[in-house]
Amino acid sequence: MLSILKKLFGTANDRTVKKLFSEITKINSLEHAIQKLSDEELKNKTVEFKEKLKNGATLDDIVYEAFAVVREAARRVCGMRHFDVQLIGGLILHRGMITEMRTGEGKTLVATLPAYLNALTGKGVHVVTVNDYLARRDSAAMGKIYNFLGLSVGCIVAGMPDEAKRAAYNADITHATNNELGFDYLRDNMKYSLQERVLRPFNFAIIDEVDSILIDEARTPLVISGPVNDNSELYGKIDKIVRLLNINDFEKDEKLKTINLTETGITHIESLLSKEGIIKPDTGLYDFENLTLVHYVNQALRAHNMFTVDVDYLVREGKVMIIDEFTGRVMEGRRYSEGLHQALEAKENVKIQNENQTLASVTFQNYFRNYPKLSGMTGTAMTEAPELKDIYNLDVVAVPTHNKVTRLDLDDEIYGSKKEKYDAILKLIKDCYDRGQPILVGTISIEKSEELSSVLNAEKIPHKVLNAKFHEQEACIIAQAGRFKAVTIATNMAGRGTDIMLGGNPEMLIEHLDKDHNYAAKIDEIKAQIAEEKKQVIEAGGLFVIGTERHESRRIDNQLRGRSGRQGDPGKTKFFLSLDDDLMRIFASDRISGVLRTLGLKDGEAIQHPMISRSLEKAQQKVEGYNYEMRKNLLRFDDVMNDQRKIIYEQRTEIIKSKDSYGFLNSTTEELAKKIVLAFMPVGSYREDWDIENLSVELHRVFAIKFDHNLVSKSDVTEEEITKIVIQMAHDVYKSKEEAYSSELMHNAVKYILLTTLDQVWKDHLYSLDHLRQGISLRAYAQKDPLSEYKREAFNLFEQMLNNLKELFIQAVYHFHIDLKHVQKEDVSLERKKLQNNMRESREDPAFSKYNAGSSLETHLKPVVSRIDPKDRNPDDPTSWGRVSRNELCPCSSGKKYKYCHGAHE
């Protein structure tokens, strides 16, 4: 019934596209008049549009004329005229939706339309890409159009100094990678003045390959972290022990990606740990004193049994580098958290980096939801439309192609074993190669791509391998994959964003030419050669895309197919599968094996049957649903932290903007003074119950004041009067500092102390939230909702953090002095440069190994309350402990963390 209605009335997508086509006629009707304009008159349209907006017009009032202007500018500057379907794509993007356009339909050119229109407001537009190469390429190519029309263009890539970034972000249109945008957002919220920040307020973002960024990378947060204790030796010892375990010592679930020790395994590892002297002979792994070791053992188990080199990560230049499972690219600067990366480093016998503590983090889900207006484009989004709508409130509209798709998608072939599958793939590659038909072979991992490469080398078939190991050559290799007799093996969707043109890409070949006296002749020669090869390739059948196995997501399979049949070109696609493939083995093995037995699968024979295709699709849908729920669940939990993050970042900005730091200091001083006095002189208590001795100690610890015991000797004195006296004494301490250092310097010092203290407590709070999150799922066993419990406890922790902030801030303000000899403007400038350098260097490894937030004041602020060597602390005398980190073990020897022991009421 539903299918009949769709045929009669069309789908919702069909109706949307039909309506948009009617709007395109309005743009086309302006084309003739716009073409008559001189270059100068065309450029002046930008000034005219800005004036209209200034006088109250909206973007929708000028959208048709603006699009017509961009179309004409592109024709004059680049020789490219926007097709009608590209204009439709532009309207979809302008209206804050996602446009699905097939590979080769010119998405980069489409983005110029909404980017130009929205940049007219002067608030900036971000065009987001997945890597630096695409950001540079698109800003250079499309920048010519924007510059012609009088708009400025910026490009953000990794490693740029802040000055250059600031200029790029202040441009009308900025091309940047999703990673750099996210990290700049975090870095900006760690800066100590508004002038040091690089980003402008969020306005409008157009995300290229939107499915890759908002879905594939949604579960991986961007993290800026700093070093904690060095446990590299322990990781090495545990790694050697885990290598001695056998297959009966643990059990793993590949569907859920979990691994646990069995009873036999626990006994075995306890004997090994005892033998190495890591635990005492009469203790067990799960005894209280050894509980910290469980984490190291679990991560070593995961490293050895759940992670595979050249599949999940690779080792390059003595470093373990993560591979993106969806793109096959190395995830530069990313490290696994919770000690897993250190366990992998121990496994691969490379230098073990220090563990890190999170200083700031954000997921792409929450970063991109900061934009008031968001849109995106990709070749494959319809399969994920419900998720994009649910999480980002983004509708997806599929735009028809300019030319009809003539690509032929052949049925899958399924074999009993991997060897039989590879034999069939090799036979097809040989056939295609002999007739000159270019072939692109898609694999799901580096390991598989190199395995297949070895098979082709043995057969002496020339080919190129495109995977994370050759990331730098990615665009060049993929661009020439359509040449005559070209054989290219690509990891998953490596090279995405670069079109495969039949016959080859002349522009990339021309880029590498030497500009000598024969330069023009060489260009003509290359163009002629490419044109001839294109004819040969079309005659051979176009690009043949071969998939070596199905991915967990149908969308990734569709992306691979989409590399062929660009702009109406001929082409074919085919997937070869075996029962050994991960998807088949883990999710669909029983069902499909039964079907194959029924159909009578023989060695070396392939099965092609609709039942198998349906079973595979069901398996993929099951995995997609599971991954969607995981991302949705992640967002629910991350939203709790995100709300708190927004509050902290807003407060931080207010502090930086504030011209009067005395207000917060004054109110907090009064609040703490009252709290301390009431703690030792409770309301309604008898005078003999007052603890004046400890009141004096506490007032000195917090406010650096010497409290005179005689003040409470009067019989009629009340706790209110004592509170007023304490507040006045604290104010006197502050005034004496102002007289010594000047009001301006004190204002800067107080602001600096407040910011550094806020950063410290926020860092500790993130650590607490991480630990809370790790164990919260266990609440389900007590019939409690883990999310509700997490919200409740996270709120309590947040309140506790704010209380800690107040006390640590007040304590620091009243206990410091400044070395006036050294506070110079030059010092401030130098320290800021050092900070920027450290932050930039840390992008290579997101651990802020040298992170030292602050200005030169930090060097010259000398607090009386400092950290004391643990050996010098007396467990029975808290006054000898100095400052204790909330996550340290309490110096009283209770075995608890300080925040759960003596620090519980701070």
Swiss-Prot record:
The gene is secA. Its main location: membrane. It catalyses: ATP + H2O + cellular proteinSide 1 = ADP + phosphate + cellular proteinSide 2. One of its GO terms (molecular function) is protein-exporting ATPase activity. Keywords: ATP-binding, Cell inner membrane, Cell membrane, Cytoplasm, Membrane, Metal-binding, Nucleotide-binding, Protein transport, Translocase, Translocation, Transport, Zinc. Residues 863-885 are annotated as: Disordered. May bind 1 zinc ion per subunit. PANTHER family: CHLOROPLAST PROTEIN-TRANSPORTING ATPASE, SECA INNER MEMBRANE COMPONENT OF SEC PROTEIN SECRETION SYSTEM. This is Protein translocase subunit SecA. SMART domains: SecA_DEAD, SecA_PP_bind.
